[in-house]
Amino acid sequence: MAATYTIKVSGAFSAAHRLPGHPGPCASMHGHNFEVMAELAAQTLVSGMVADFMDVRAALDACFARLDHACLNDVPELSPPTAEVIAAWIFGELRARLEDGRVRVAKVSVVESEGLAASYAETP
């Protein structure tokens, strides 16, 4: 059985959104301090690491630059702007920036509010 190493890097951004057609209060504009956790995996290490934490942080920060203090309804890729859709979008952005044949993005989780989170992962 092959061993897998993983690392996790987290960050946060603040944004507003609304969920049109939602039967509850989320149909109205409201905001969150979103927390994001990205998990990367590799079966081999380079210089003892899956990836440099700072490289992963920079890739996350590039995502946050597009989302922080924005209205997520104005970001076409985030339709509808649910935590699940945000997690999938960040996953794709990180995959494009960080995957190299050795390292893969394993999972991205987005915490919308305390105790409420969604994750996106793809089977390798």
Regions found by a protein language model. Give the residues of each.
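Charge-rich, low-complexity N-terminal segments
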Residues: 1-124
